[in-house]
A protein has these predicted regions:
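Acidic (Asp/Glu) and glycine-rich low-complexity loops/linkers
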Residues: 1-52, 58-71, 77-89, 105-107, ...
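Short, surface-exposed interaction patches in beta-rich subdomains
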Residues: 76-175
């Protein structure tokens, strides 16, 4: 099931605040300039976050698997209290921004269309990145990083991993 919150017959922007209590939260989706703020840490096995259309998600989580999708000028600000077994997958597109910090094991980042993944403060063991079309990624990988950049995009390294594999085309940078 899902919880939908709407203002009936309203065309004027109206700020409303809603308190929700759910001990089994495993997915959050925002759109249309809405904002989701978790006041307490979300503890769950798997967590999926999807934001679009200039919406925002702000939270702290302790999860074994995190999937993040951000598009259409939306923003996400995530603190992850994971461990070396935590998997993180982030996809950003269309001028959206995902900022994430904390600790995890493996990360897969995919950015496109002028979006940003700001993950220089998320300490990973291993990471794979793919940036394209004017997007950018900042990444922190301790052991291994596979980085791919194309079409005017960039990948910035917050540290130097033990093993680095780079695939970049002209007009891009990985450094």
């Amino acid at each position: 099931g899902g919880l939908g919150i709407f203002i009936k017959n309203s065309i004027n922007p109206t700020k409303i605040e809603v308190a929700v209590f759910n001990p089994n939260l495993n997915a959050i989706e925002t759109s249309s300039a809405s904002e989701f703020i978790a006041t307490n840490e979300i503890n769950t096995q798997n967590l999926t976050l999807e934001s679009g259309s200039a919406s925002n998600i702000i939270l702290t989580t302790n999860t074994a698997a995190l999937f993040v999708e951000s598009s259409s000028a939306s923003k996400q600000n995530i603190t992850l209290n994971g461990n070396k077994n935590t998997n993180v997958n982030i996809e950003s597109s269309s001028a959206s921004t995902v900022k994430i910090e904390g600790i995890a094991g493996t990360g897969n980042y995919d950015s496109s269309s002028a979006s940003s993944i700001k993950a220089g403060d998320l300490q990973l063991q291993n990471a794979t990145t793919s940036s394209s079309s004017g997007s950018n990624i900042k990444v922190f990988a301790i052991e291994k990083l596979n980085a791919n950049a194309s079409s005017g995009s960039s990948t910035k390294l917050a540290n130097k991993p033990k093993e680095l594999q780079i695939d970049e085309s002209s007009g891009t940078s990985i450094n």
